[in-house]
Design a protein with these regions (language model features):
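Short, flexible, basic/aromatic active-site loop/helix in glycosyltransferases
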Residues: 138-174
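Short, well-formed alpha-helical segments that are part of the catalytic scaffolds
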Residues: 12-25
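Short beta-strand-to-loop acidic/aromatic patch adjacent to the donor-nucleotide binding site
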Residues: 85-97
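Non-catalytic, C-terminal membrane-associated alpha-helical segments of glycosyltransferases
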Residues: 240-289
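Conserved donor NDP-sugar-binding/catalytic core segment of glycosyltransferases
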Residues: 97-134
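A short, conserved alpha-helix in the catalytic core of glycosyltransferases
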Residues: 167-169, 173-226
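A conserved acidic beta->alpha catalytic loop
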Residues: 22, 36-45, 64
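Glycine-rich, basic loop-to-helix element that forms the pyrophosphate-binding segment
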Residues: 62-82
Length: 289
């Protein structure tokens, strides 16, 4: 049993190299596809020189930086247009590490149950034994409202977080998995499931997981296995200011509600107003730092 890795790089060649150099030694990895998202920092040249002679690595470059969904879709299209043996396709951030035994376990979960469309391991904070939120319920309107208000943000997590008692299950059926590591059945991708490249960054997980569930595949978290996540290194390198990341999040949420959710313009107006007010407060706080 093997898998194919798709790793999206943007202005972060060293983090990508750190991950790929480890994956090269895993017998369970058939091919590693690195998609450079038109990095302006010479990443593509660095990666090309570094992996030029390695047949296990395919290096692609997108014609533009279209964001997470756009870049990963190029990698998915490459997989579907080539005759690879693997039935498991892993969409991975470069700022993660997964041990080979954990990766093998995830591949086995998919291979053992073809009704599972996508699976992810538990997500740990790198260098610690602390787990991050590894899965959540599909965000509802109230969650998106309350999470837009700083005072209510932690309380709002109650709308989407699963009870800790559920995590004793080795295979836990969930709504949404984080986009930092998604192991997807190739047959799901062959049925036309891809990321919505109208979204530059954020909300991509809730959209693709919902698409997979709508095809009556299961979205599951495997609690027996884990991976380390280095606290969004890649995103923070590209968007160092919190206000820049918040602007992207707000833009994606607004687009999500316009395209996928309520057509109630009053509800949407109230949500968008909360998001814009929170963004204004963030900018105001930044002026006094």
């Amino acid at each position: 049993m093997q898998c194919i890795f798709i790793i999206l790089n943007y202005n972060d060649s060293q983090t990508t190299i750190n991950l790929v150099d480890k994956l090269l030694h895993y017998s369970s990895v058939e091919k590693i596809i690195i998609l450079d998202n038109k990095s302006p920092d010479n990443s593509f040249k660095v990666l090309k020189n570094y992996y030029n002679t390695m047949v296990k690595v395919v290096l692609l470059q997108s014609p533009k930086n279209g964001g997470y969904s756009y870049g990963n879709n190029i990698g998915i299209n490459y997989v579907l247009n080539h005759n690879f043996n693997s039935e498991c396709v892993v969409i991975s951030n470069p700022d993660i590490f997964i041990a080979e035994q954990d990766l093998n376990g995830i591949i086995h979960v998919l291979d053992a149950d073809k009704t599972i469309g996508v699976v992810a391991p538990m997500m740990k904070i790198a260098g610690a034994d602390t787990f991050k939120i590894s899965a959540w319920r599909h965000p509802c309107y109230l969650y998106d409202c309350f999470s837009s208000v700083p005072f209510f943000r932690r309380w709002a997590d109650k709308f989407i977080c699963y009870d800790k008692s559920l995590f004793i299950q080795p295979i836990m059926r969930v709504d949404v998995l984080p986009g930092s590591f998604l192991a997807i059945q190739k047959q799901v991708l062959q049925r036309g499931i891809k990321f919505d490249d109208r979204f530059f960054l954020f909300c991509e997980e809730r959209i693709i997981c919902e698409k997979i569930r709508n095809l009556e595949y299961k979205v599951v978290l495997s609690t027996l296995f884990s991976y380390d996540h280095y606290e969004s290194i890649s995103i923070k390198k590209s968007y160092s200011r919190a206000t820049a990341r918040q602007r992207l999040l707000n833009d994606s949420k607004k687009k999500y509600y316009k395209l996928y959710r309520s057509k109630n313009h009053i509800r949407n107006f109230l949500l968008f107003l909360l998001m814009d007010f929170n963004f204004f407060l963030m900018q105001l706080r930044g002026l006094f730092k």
